[in-house]
Each structure stands twice: as structure tokens, then as C-alpha cells.
Design a protein with these regions (language model features):
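Ribonuclease/tRNase effector modules and their secretory precursors
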Residues: 1-97
């Protein structure tokens, strides 16, 4: 797998504003937290972006990224209640049956 890169300034802002970091996302991916890779819903505005769906600390985050020739560039981290419901709570209900 290609390495991940990101903007240090954006990473610092995410830590302050949302309490999450790109390092945490990469650790979660490395420990099996990658749940899905989606096409960006607005391909016209973001033609080369896709979205990583990552589980970390019992929550799901959407991480838009651009695949470069030698690395993946992570753009931001979006906490998602809807993705948490769809990816984690649905699997918890399945496990109870």
C-alpha cells in the first residue's frame, strides 16, 4: 500500500477543532479500521477525490483523499453519525442475532 501524506497545518487544525488527527486515521487503517472506499459524491467539483470510510474509537470518519503516483494525500477528516449508524451499529445488530 502507498504511504499517506497530509498537510501539517490541516492536521493541527483538525486536532484543535475536532479532536482527531491524520496519524490516528492511519493507525486505525493499519489495525483493520478501513471499512470502505467510496467515490466522492460531488465528482464534478472534486474529480480526483475518493473517500476512505474509517472506524476509530467506536466512531466512523469519512476521509477524502487524492491518489497520487507514489502516495495517498489525505484532505480532511469528517466525523459521520450516519456512517457510524450504517457501518457500525448495523454490524452490532447483526452480531446480536
Amino acid at each position: 500500500m502507498k504511504p499517506f501524506r497530509w498537510s501539517p497545518e490541516k492536521n493541527e487544525a483538525l486536532q484543535v477543532e475536532r479532536g482527531v488527527s491524520f496519524e490516528g486515521v492511519v493507525v486505525a487503517i493499519g489495525s483493520g479500521g478501513l471499512l470502505d472506499v467510496l467515490a466522492h459524491p460531488n465528482e464534478a467539483k472534486y474529480p480526483h477525490q475518493r473517500i476512505l470510510v474509517v472506524a476509530a474509537d467506536d466512531y466512523v470518519y469519512l476521509v477524502p483523499f487524492v491518489e497520487e503516483e507514489r502516495f495517498f494525500f489525505l484532505k480532511t477528516i469528517i466525523p459521520s453519525r450516519k456512517a457510524t449508524r450504517d457501518y457500525l451499529q448495523g454490524s452490532e445488530l447483526d452480531a446480536e442475532d
